[in-house]
């Protein structure tokens, strides 16, 4: 994980922070092969919108009319939505995409839950053990055993349980800003980790 003292100063063009975050993620990735970035969460709920907002910042290089370019890694990105809107579980959607695209790895981006308030909106976290949300619903759990490919996870803590036994959550004061800046920063770090031959400035220009 990478701790950031002030997320709002570490915008998507802060190359030092982006390079540090990319350096955390890059060793977890396979050395080559296509990568599918999955934006997990509900774009209509601010605290849960980090995944969908981040995939909008990912440099996508795959497509039906895309010509492979030497040195550019094939990358696809999608935000599958929530099961209440699609009628399909996250596992079903991720499994179908993996079977169709056959990526070397699946990178899931999601809002995280923290047990420590000081970590809210201030930590970029990366894992190579899959995505295991706090909810007891196992249809949202994604890992190599279920999907047959390495599953990485990336995210920022955006909420925490208020008190044990109470159905309340705590979020950062400026949650909209945390999601907006966090998605931009995380997207830039993912791009840099996936495309090491392109500079931060080049990637920012390509994504827009």
Task: Spell out what each predicted region is.
Residues 71-102, 106:
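A structural-propensity feature for long, helix-poor, extended segments
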Residues 35, 104-105, 151:
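Conserved acidic residues
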Residues 39-50, 84, 111-115:
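Gly/Ser/Thr-rich loops at beta-strand to alpha-helix junctions
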Residues 78-79, 92, 108-208:
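A structural signal for small-residue-enriched, beta-sheet-centric alpha/beta enzyme cores
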Residues 42-73, 77:
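Glycine-rich phosphate/diphosphate-binding loop of Rossmann-like nucleotide-binding domains
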Residues 1-32:
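Extended, charged alpha/beta regions that create polyanion-binding interfaces
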Residues 12, 16, 20, 49, ...:
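Conserved active-site and cofactor/substrate-binding residues in soluble primary-metabolism enzymes
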Residues 3-5, 34-45, 77-81:
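Short glycine-rich or small-residue beta-strand-to-loop segments that form or flank ligand, phosphate
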